[in-house]
Structures are given as structure tokens and as C-alpha cells.
A protein has these predicted regions:
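Conserved acidic donor-binding segment of nucleotide-sugar-dependent glycosyltransferases
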Residues: 241-243, 247-254, 263-268
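Carbohydrate-associated surface elements
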Residues: 86, 110
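A conserved mid-protein helix/loop that constitutes part of the nucleotide-sugar donor-binding site
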Residues: 125-154, 158, 165-172, 255
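Short hydrophobic beta-strand element within catalytic cores of glycosyltransferases
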Residues: 226-230
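Short alpha-helical donor nucleotide-sugar binding micro-motif in glycosyltransferases
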Residues: 188-189, 196-201
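Nucleotide-activated donor-binding/catalytic signature segment of Leloir-type glycosyltransferases, i.e.
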Residues: 171-189
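A short, well-ordered alpha-helix in the C-terminal region of glycosyltransferases
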Residues: 256, 263, 270-284, 293-296
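Aromatic "clamp/platform" in nucleotide-sugar-dependent glycosyltransferases that forms part
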Residues: 209
Length: 305
């Protein structure tokens, strides 16, 4: 056991040494880091003539370690790229007076619109949910909510795409709730199948307890699928325009969630109107739009170096 621990420490040290060497060897240009530990090294060892950009691809969730690092160990980072405006505002509050040189900017992930067919989508009475079957994703409460919905809407199906540690537990819950006929747990699916199922679905259901920037919601909107989601701390609110391309439900308000789902499931005309607004939102996050933000950031910043 001790030998394994020593071996792991050696590997980590060699990775650290290799990363430090790579960073110091770059005399000019741009370095973009996507992990906290790498961003710390970039701040410490990056050359003055190098544009140093850090990214955060998840919610910091107010963890003291992250906040301390942003304030004290990112001081030579030029730009910190965040996924949402809310994360940007929070981090700016954390670092003020401690890290005054680093600038925070918002650049979301982009969507490849070419993955989707150009034909008119033929929608089915299907609600879809996609993600890893992990406790934080809230699939347990999704099934309990669906159990109540399915009693009034037996003609609708819930399809869950994804695998993970809770798969067997959730399958057991489906049986306990007697919703086997209306729930299809499809397991892990390749991306082509995910897109195909999105194109057929009429609604997307998200019951996560925590999210960062749920990219799957952008994919849903490109497939003209309105979303109903709990308004957790960050994530869904950055994508969903309440009442326009979906609905945000106050977290834990399960009865309101059920009521909203039943309303939209019963009103096809409303869904059709929302579908067009979904596409408009998704197009704001297409590759060309997002890449232009990156190009602009890098080109304008290098002029100042």
C-alpha cells in the first residue's frame, strides 16, 4: 500500500515537473488552461510575453479552496473565462482587492449545428432526459415526479439516456413506482442516437440538484425541444428564458414542476410556439458566434501585450 502511495506521488511530481517545463519553454503566444491546478502553474511560471488564459468549466460552488486559489494563485493570469454571467459576477466579487489584474469574461461552450438534420422534426409524445446517472443529477426525483404525471398522461413516454453509478438503483425505483410502461431507460447511447432521440422529443426534463452550463440543453433547443428545469444555483437560468423557450421552476417545488409539465404536455400550440424560440437561443451559441468571441479576446489582448 505504501509503495503504491510513493509511486503515485512520483507520478504527480513528474507531471508537475513536465507541465512546469512546458509552460516556461513558451516565450510568446497564448496558453489556455482548463484545470485549476494547471492554471496555478500557468500563473506562476508563464512568461510575461505570453497571454495567459484560465477557464472554469464547472460551478465553483463556493468551495474555499477554489476561491482562495482564484484570489491568491491566479494573480498573473490575464483572463479568466467563465461559462455564465452569474459565475463571472461571483468570481469578480471574490477576487476584488486581492487579484486586481486578472479580468473575468464570459464565453460559453458552442454547439455544432451541423449535427442536426435540416428537415422538419416529427415530434412524438416523448419527454427526454440525458445525463450520467449520478445523485447530483436528480433522476430519483424525476421518476417520482413522472409517476404522478404519467397517471394523467398515459400516452406520453419518458426516455432517459445515460449510464452511471445509480443505474440499477433507478431501474429498481421504476419498478417500485410501477411506471415500467411509460419509462424507457436506454442506457449509454452514442451521440448519433442522442441527436436522433432529441429530434423526436417534444419536451426536455431536467431535475438536477446542481449544474454548471448544461450543454445538453443547448442541444435540446437546437432540436426544437422546450425545457422544464428546476432553477438551481447556476446553469439552466443561463439558457432557459422562462416562458419563452422553457420554464424555470423554483428548486424543490415539485408540485409546481408537475403542474407546469402537465400544462405544456396538454397544449400543443404552446409547444409549437416555444420550439421556434428554442432554435433562436441555440443559434446564439453556434460555433461561429462563440469562436468569434475567442478570436476577438485573443487578438485584442495580444495587441496590448
Amino acid at each position: 500500500m505504501m509503495q503504491e502511495g510513493i509511486k503515485a506521488i512520483k507520478i504527480l511530481y513528474l507531471k508537475y515537473k513536465s507541465m512546469r517545463k512546458a509552460i516556461t519553454s513558451i516565450k510568446e503566444g497564448v496558453i489556455i488552461s482548463t484545470r485549476n491546478e494547471h492554471s496555478i502553474l500557468l500563473s506562476k511560471y508563464g512568461q510575461d510575453n505570453v497571454l495567459k488564459i484560465a477557464q472554469l468549466h464547472h460551478d465553483h460552488n463556493f468551495k474555499k479552496k477554489y476561491i482562495k486559489d482564484f484570489r491568491e494563485k491566479y494573480t498573473k493570469i490575464d483572463y479568466f473565462v467563465l461559462l455564465t454571467e452569474q459565475l463571472k459576477e461571483e468570481i469578480e466579487t471574490f477576487i476584488k482587492e486581492k487579484n486586481t489584474d486578472m479580468k473575468c469574461v464570459v464565453i460559453p461552450n458552442f454547439l455544432d449545428v451541423n449535427e442536426f438534420s435540416e428537415k422538419n422534426f416529427e415530434k412524438e409524445k416523448t419527454v427526454i432526459a440525458i445525463g450520467r446517472l449520478h445523485p447530483v443529477k436528480g433522476f430519483d426525483r424525476m421518476l417520482r415526479i413522472w409517476e404522478k404525471i404519467s397517471k394523467k398522461h398515459p400516452e406520453w413516454q419518458l426516455k432517459i439516456l445515460g449510464g452511471g453509478e445509480e443505474e440499477e438503483k433507478l431501474k429498481m425505483l421504476v419498478k417500485e413506482l410501477h411506471i415500467e410502461k411509460s419509462v424507457n431507460m436506454m442506457g449509454m447511447c452514442n451521440h448519433d442516437i442522442v441527436i436522433e432521440e432529441l429530434e423526436k422529443a417534444s419536451l426536455y426534463m431536467m431535475t438536477s440538484y446542481s449544474e454548471a452550463f448544461p450543454f445538453v440543453l443547448i442541444e435540446a433547443m437546437m432540436a426544437e425541444v422546450p425545457v422544464v428545469a428546476f432553477d438551481v444555483r447556476v446553469g439552466p437560468k443561463a439558457i432557459i428564458q422562462d416562458g419563452e423557450n422553457g420554464y424555470l421552476i423554483e428548486d424543490k417545488e415539485e408540485e409546481k414542476f408537475i403542474e407546469t409539465m402537465e400544462y405544456i404536455m396538454s397544449h400543443e400550440k404552446e409547444r409549437v410556439i416555444m420550439r421556434k424560440k428554442c432554435v433562436k437561443k441555440a443559434e446564439e451559441l453556434c460555433e461561429d458566434v462563440v469562436m468569434e468571441k475567442w478570436v476577438s479576446l485573443i487578438e485584442n489582448s495580444r495587441k496590448m501585450k
